[in-house]
Amino acid sequence: MKTIILFFLIQGIVLAQKPPYDVFPDAEPPYYRVRYEAKQVGDLAFPVKFTIWIPEEVNTLRGIIVHQHGCGEGSCKSGLTGAWDLHWQALARKHDCALMAPSYEQPQKANCQLWCDPRNGSDDAFRQSLVDLGKLSGHPELATIPWALWGHSGGGHWAGGMVMLHPDRIIAAWLRSGVPYLQTNPDRPDIKAHQLPRQALEVPIMCNLGTKEGYSDKSGRFARVWPANLAFFETISAQQGRIAYSIAPLTSHECGNQRYLAIPRF
C-alpha cells in the first residue's frame, strides 16, 4: 500500500512540472534542490527550483555565488544545470562558497517581470530556499552568509534589484545585458523603478553587455540594452557608487565569453 501511495505522489510531482522544466539532473550530495509551486512562498507567479552545489571539503561556507538565468523558456531551462558548471564551481571552491542556480518555470510568452522583479515574490522564494537548503544540506549558515550575484538579461534585472533591496547582504553583482530601472520609463510602464538606497552605492557592480546591444549597433532587437545600462551607470556613478561597465566586442545579447572576464574579477 505504501508503495502505491509513493508511486502516485511521485507521479503527481512529475506531472506538475511541465516541459521543458520536467527534465533535469538528479540532485545528489554535494548537490541539493528545493522546489516551490507558484504562490507557495509569497506572491511568486511561477514554480521555481533552487539547486545548490556545496564543496564537500568545506565545513562552514563563507558565501553564495548565484548564477541567475534570463527570461524565456530557453534561458530559464538553462538554470536546471547551472549548478553543474565547472568554471563557476572552481570559483566557488576557491572562496569556500556554495554555487546556486535557480530555474523559474516561466512559460515562453509570460511576463518575465513576474519573477525578474524580485518584489514580485522571487526575493521571498530565494531567501526561503536558503533556509530550506540549509536544513537539507546541514549548512544552516546558508540563511545568513553573503551573496555574490551574477545575472543575464532578466537575471541581471533581478540581481540589480536585489542590490537595491538587500545591499547589506551582497558582496558584488555582475549584470550581463540587463539592469533594473532607477527611473520610470514611459516606454515600459510594466517595469517598476527601484529606489536607490545609500548602502547600495557601496556594492561593487559591473554592467556588462555586448557591443551589438545598442552600443555599436543602434538598431535591432536589443538596441535598448545599452541606453538602459548607461542610465543605470550614470545614476549610480553620479553618487560616487562603486560601478563600472564593460563592452564585449563580439556579441549581442548572448553571453559569449564574458565568463572569462566575470569569473576572475568576482
What function would you assign to each model-found segment?
Residues 3-12:
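Sec-dependent N-terminal signal peptides
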Residues 58-109, 182-183, 215-217:
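Short substrate-entry loop that stabilizes the transition state in hydrolases
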Residues 60-64, 94-100, 143-147, 167-172, ...:
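Loop/turn elements at helix/coil->beta-strand transitions in domains of secreted/extracellular proteins
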Residues 114-140:
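Alpha/beta-hydrolase active-site loop
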Residues 70-72, 95, 123-124, 148-150, ...:
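Serine-hydrolase-like catalytic core of hydrolytic proteins
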Residues 262-266:
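Catalytic active-site module of serine/aspartate enzymes centered on a nucleophile-bearing elbow/loop
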Residues 171-260:
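The feature captures the conserved acid-bearing segment of alpha/beta-hydrolase catalytic domains
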Residues 16-64, 94-95, 145-168:
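A domain-start/cap signature at the N-terminus of enzymes
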